[in-house]
Regions:
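Flexible "arm" and connector segments at domain edges
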Residues: 1-117
Length: 117
């Protein structure tokens, strides 16, 4: 499935939970900062899973790291769809840009003060 199609599916399924006022059924104006921090919290939960080598409590056959990162991806994609951001196009462009980034080369990373991670 393409990222664009996945984005539409995620927003169709998740959108009513986050973008609609549960009491009125009307569209809800979400705080972008709050939503971005919810993404950060999913990544933090993934880190906790790595740190403690945990399995997920809801999907016990999967590592917590994997499930929390899936939550982060779902939140990112839903956020982008809800704010009319072309995440698929941005990912494609960013990957193309990164292919030729001077600071991503082996030589640049090995250089003094090069990116180590």
């Amino acid at each position: 499935m393409s990222l664009s199609k996945l984005a539409k599916q995620i927003h169709t399924e998740e959108g009513p939970k986050w973008w609609v006022d549960l009491e009125t059924g009307l569209p809800k104006d979400r705080n972008p900062g709050e939503m971005l921090m919810l993404i950060v919290s999913e990544v933090a939960e993934a880190m906790e899973g790595v740190r403690k080598n945990l399995m997920d409590d809801k999907l016990p056959h999967r590592k917590a790291e994997e499930v929390e990162l899936a939550d982060a991806v779902i939140r990112i994609i839903d956020y982008c769809e809800g704010r009319n951001l072309d995440i698929a196009g941005a990912v494609e462009e960013k990957m193309a840009y990164n292919r030729n980034r001077a600071d991503h080369t082996r030589e640049a990373r090995l250089a003094t003060n090069g990116k180590k991670f």
